[in-house]
């Protein structure tokens, strides 16, 4: 059967082969776009809203180098650099105790590199521990979907081992041995206060 257009022309079928479309991988919606920092920020916001704990993320200090003043009433930063933070990322109060911790994540599946920490952070956490504060490290192995709560007094020996010429990383087995795994939830996302309750209260 011939097909005709309203203008009277005949339809000419094209015999060109269309390129085959590539199959897309299925989309996974779990934890999409979420980092450890996002999860912790959501968690501490939940704690604050529900008056469970007061914990805040400290802003990263910035060194401003150059500022442009296009108008008297406005300023535009032209050049700035992140300073190395002198303490940890998070601090606050829970059940009358000072809480201080550092959070790190890695894509590694077998170990955590200690180069993610700095001397001044270790010194700060050791000082908090001396004052009887609750101080710990949260480490997330993103590819494994595991997040670990490690009391500082159990984490610090790994740092000392590296300082004395030993391993520059902590194996996943070592971390699992000294940590409390934090399960992912909805609200709060990463309920690390469960670990504090279990280990300190």
UniProtKB/Swiss-Prot annotation:
DNA damage as UniProt keyword: yes
Binding, Mg(2+): 87, 89, 102, 121
Organism domain of life: Bacteria
GO terms under biological process: chromosome segregation; DNA recombination; DNA repair
Cofactor note: Binds 1 Mg(2+) ion per subunit.
Coiled-coil regions listed: none
Cofactor or coenzyme needed: Mg(2+)
Enzyme Commission number: 3.1.21.10
CDD domains hit by this protein: RecU-like (cd22354)
Keywords: Cytoplasm, DNA damage, DNA recombination, DNA repair, Endonuclease, Hydrolase, Magnesium, Metal-binding, Nuclease
One example GO MF annotation: nucleic acid binding
Enzyme class (EC, first level): hydrolase
Keyword Magnesium: yes
Annotated catalysed reactions: Endonucleolytic cleavage at a junction such as a reciprocal single-stranded crossover between two homologous DNA duplexes (Holliday junction)
Pfam family, one: RecU
Cellular compartment(s): Cytoplasm
Family, as annotated: Belongs to the RecU family.
Stated role: Endonuclease that resolves Holliday junction intermediates in genetic recombination. Cleaves mobile four-strand junctions by introducing symmetrical nicks in paired strands. Promotes annealing of linear ssDNA with homologous dsDNA. Required for DNA repair, homologous recombination and chromosome segregation.
HAMAP family per record: RecU
Official protein name in the record: Holliday junction resolvase RecU
Species assigned in the record: Listeria monocytogenes serovar 1/2a (strain ATCC BAA-679 / EGD-e)
Gene giving rise to this polypeptide: recU
């Amino acid at each position: 059967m011939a097909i005709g257009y309203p203008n009277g022309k005949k339809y000419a079928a094209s015999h060109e082969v269309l390129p085959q479309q590539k199959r897309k991988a299925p989309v996974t919606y779990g934890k999409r776009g979420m980092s450890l920092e996002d999860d912790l920020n959501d968690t501490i916001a939940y704690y604050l809203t529900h008056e469970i704990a007061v914990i805040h993320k400290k802003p990263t200090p910035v060194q401003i180098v150059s500022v442009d003043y296009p108008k008297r009433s406005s300023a535009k930063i032209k050049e700035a650099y992140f300073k190395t933070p002198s303490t940890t990322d998070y601090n606050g109060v829970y059940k009358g105790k000072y809480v201080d911790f550092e959070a790190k994540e890695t894509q590694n599946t077998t170990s955590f590199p200690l180069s993610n920490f700095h001397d001044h952070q270790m010194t700060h956490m050791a000082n908090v521990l001396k004052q009887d504060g609750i101080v710990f490290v949260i480490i997330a192995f993103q590819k494994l979907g595991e997040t670990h709560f490690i009391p500082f007094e159990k984490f610090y020996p790994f740092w000392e081992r590296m300082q004395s010429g030993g391993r520059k990383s902590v194996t996943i087995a070592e971390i699992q041995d000294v940590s409390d795994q934090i399960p992912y939830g909805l609200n709060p996302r990463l309920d690390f206060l469960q670990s504090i309750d279990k280990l300190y209260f």
